[in-house]
Regions:
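N-terminal glycine-/charge-rich "phosphate-binding" loop or analogous flexible N-terminal tail
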Residues: 1-61
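Rossmann-like adenosine-cofactor binding region
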Residues: 70-72, 191-285
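Glycine-rich Rossmann-fold phosphate-binding loop(s) that bind the pyrophosphate
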Residues: 166-167
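NAD(P)-binding Rossmann-fold cofactor-contacting core
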Residues: 179-197
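Adenosine-phosphate binding glycine-rich loop
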Residues: 276, 280-281, 289-310, 316
Length: 319
């Protein structure tokens, strides 16, 4: 059987040291693509596309990841056989428009990346229920590093956890939380009551979620209409000792109002994996507030986890 003609396309990614293709298609995944297809021997970038274009006319599928070049109409004219792009990463918004207009199938490993985010959030939710983050702050001084003095959370039994947005990540987190005796509140206007029953969750309003839950985890979709929707009034309504987790988008939070609330309410904790802008600029109060923990967009796939994204695209290709 004739193998399908394929090529790796990539411009590299600034946040990955070294070759991003080798990073994502690691542990023999690049070799798998080589073995199961007729792979073009050179990785194609914006810089070398014209040099190789005449030899790419028969390419039927592209494998890629972060750093996929944007192919314009003139570029696609030189790829007449192209039928599919397999993107071992998340959002395709940055490059997919012209491809979709040509009816090229664009596959993404968004679901695989969602697994990593949900697992990250699971760890934070469970630790937040225990009061771990506030407790570690207390334990920095000998006066408060005592079991009868340091902060203790409500624990992982019967507490309310709010998930804002029941998309791919939100639903995966719900699934991961299922073994624990927790009550899951969900804010999502598109979630039907039947779906909520099937997921064993309770639909609530945004105001109810912040007011009732001990941990609130944001998974809203990245839409302009949702910018700054999470405001100071919501944060100020949170229960004593509650925790806000953001692995969604920093722009969805009114950060100046969040800072004001955190200054007035040192009992609250904010775990921010995303801010607006990223990275968090020098001089931001987020660096100074003890009840803020910043991480560098760590929730998504990193390290060994990225191979799952390559596996997802290889499996999709084999279909």
């Amino acid at each position: 059987m004739k193998k399908i003609n394929t090529a790796f396309f990539n411009n590299g990614a600034s946040f990955v040291k070294g070759d991003v293709i080798d990073y994502v298609y690691a542990r023999g995944r690049r070799q798998q693509v080589t073995a199961m297809t007729d792979l073009y021997p050179v990785v194609i970038s914006t810089e070398n596309f014209k040099e190789h274009a005449d030899k790419l006319a028969g390419v039927e599928a592209i494998f890629t990841t972060w750093g996929m070049p944007v192919l314009e109409t003139a570029d696609l004219d030189r790829l007449p056989a192209l039928r599919a792009v397999f993107y071992a990463a998340g959002s395709v918004k940055g490059f997919a428009k012209a491809l979709l207009q040509r009816r090229v199938t664009v596959c993404s490993s968004w679901t695989a990346n969602a697994v990593s985010v949900a697992e990250f959030c699971l760890g934070q939710v469970l630790l937040a229920c225990k009061g771990y983050f506030q407790n570690t702050l207390d334990c920095r001084t000998p006066q408060r590093n005592r079991q009868d003095v340091a902060f203790h959370g409500r624990g992982v039994y019967g507490e309310k956890i709010a998930i804002i947005g029941a998309g791919q990540i939100g639903r995966r987190l719900i699934e991961l939380l299922r073994p624990f005796r927790l009550k899951i509140l969900v804010v999502d206007p598109y979630l039907s009551e039947t779906e909520a029953d099937d997921l064993h969750v309770q639909k609530v309003t945004l105001e109810e979620a912040f007011r009732e839950a001990y941990v609130v985890s944001n998974h809203l979709p990245d839409l302009p209409t949702l910018q700054k929707v999470l405001d100071g009034k919501l944060f100020d309504s949170m229960r004593p000792g509650a925790t806000f987790i953001n692995t969604g988008r920093g722009a969805q939070v009114n950060e100046s109002e969040l800072i004001d609330v955190l200054r007035r309410r040192p009992d609250l904790m904010a775990l921010l994996d995303v801010t607006d802008p990223e990275p968090t600029p020098a001089g931001s109060a987020f660096y100074e507030l003890p009840n803020v923990q910043l991480s560098s967009h760590l929730a998504g796939a990193h390290g060994d986890e990225v191979v799952r994204m390559a596996d997802t695209m290889i499996e999709e290709f084999r279909r």
